[in-house]
């Protein structure tokens, strides 16, 4: 069905120690090839079903909040390598390959549409797709969420017209593909609207709500179901530097859920007002909304380490290992694992 597919890397068994996570926050430490290859669909299915469910993750957060030390043993998870090369659309590009993850021969098709948060969640969706015999088709573009709104890109110091063009391209692909499910996701932190020759944060929430509603309505006739995947909690300290500097303090790198500010002076934690409004917009327009903050925070705290894993890759993304660890819970919450 899909003529263009990017080359995919095999799934190694990745061994990640907390010491390494402190310095690289989610990169590969070493590979243990004595274990069965997670690239085999049957093996991957078993691995996903063995990962924690939502209640187990929530209990792990409770445990993290009361921890007196960081785990001394490395965490072992089968996670994908970095598949962004040739798949995630760069700033000046306006089309995408539509890379296929999950089960390339799957009988169902799920489209992921959004900014770098699409790539962030790929370890989970790839595993879900393999388990559920589902093709996961990626349409992602750097700093370009799926909502229909005109944004400013500070990197280019101008209106991000390439984002507008890219989103029109993806909408056309969805119309042609008629997928079973479309998942929309994007990070709101740092988003700015165009105001003359500069960007402004004023009015972002209204524009985001209207733009998300417009996108949902646009894809509804061509998708069996539309899911809006909610935003994450954003860390206040820089994850890698903080974990490296505070290896003996399990809570030095935690972030308050509300009222937090990162080291660059930007808001951090959970943007509850934004999430609540996005959920309302999604549900009012017939989409399913899936919140992810329950897997990141508890009692007004968002730990930096949960279940022995560094939660964050950087200021804007959770780590590949943590995303993969959420595969079972995310697959259940979205209804993609049955």
Regions flagged by a language model, labelled:
Residues 2-338:
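Extracellular/periplasmic envelope-modification machinery, especially enzymes
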């Amino acid at each position: 069905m899909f003529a263009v597919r990017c080359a995919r890397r095999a799934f190694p068994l990745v061994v990640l120690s907390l010491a390494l996570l402190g310095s690289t926050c989610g990169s590969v430490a070493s590979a243990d090839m004595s274990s069965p290859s997670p690239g085999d669909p049957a093996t991957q299915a078993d691995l996903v079903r063995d990962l924690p469910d939502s209640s187990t993750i929530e209990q792990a957060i409770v445990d993290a909040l009361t921890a007196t030390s960081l785990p001394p043993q490395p965490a072992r998870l089968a996670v994908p390598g970095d598949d962004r090369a040739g798949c995630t659309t760069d700033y000046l590009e306006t089309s995408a390959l539509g890379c296929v993850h999950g089960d390339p021969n799957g009988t169902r098709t799920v489209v992921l549409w959004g900014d770098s948060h699409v790539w962030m969640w790929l370890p989970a969706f790839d595993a879900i797709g393999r388990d559920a015999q589902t093709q996961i088709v990626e349409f992602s573009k750097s700093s370009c969420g799926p909502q229909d709104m005109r944004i400013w890109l500070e990197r280019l110091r101008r209106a991000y017209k390439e984002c507008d063009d890219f989103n029109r391209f993806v909408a056309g692909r969805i119309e042609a593909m008629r997928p079973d499910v479309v998942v929309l996701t994007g990070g709101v932190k740092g988003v700015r609207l165009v105001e003359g020759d500069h960007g402004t944060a004023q009015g972002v929430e209204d524009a985001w709500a209207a733009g998300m509603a417009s996108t949902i309505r646009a894809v509804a006739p061509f998708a069996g179901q539309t899911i809006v995947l909610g935003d994450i909690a954003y860390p206040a300290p820089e994850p890698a530097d903080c974990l490296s500097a505070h290896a003996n303090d399990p809570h030095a790198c935690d972030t308050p859920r509300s009222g937090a500010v990162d080291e660059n002076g930007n808001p951090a934690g959970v943007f509850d007002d934004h999430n609540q409004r996005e959920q309302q917009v999604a549900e009012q327009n017939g989409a399913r909304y899936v919140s992810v903050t329950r897997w990141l925070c508890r009692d007004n705290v968002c730990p930096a380490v949960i279940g022995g894993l560094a939660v964050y890759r950087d200021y804007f993304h959770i780590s590949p290992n943590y995303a993969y660890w959420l595969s079972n819970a995310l697959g259940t919450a979205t209804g993609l694992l049955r």
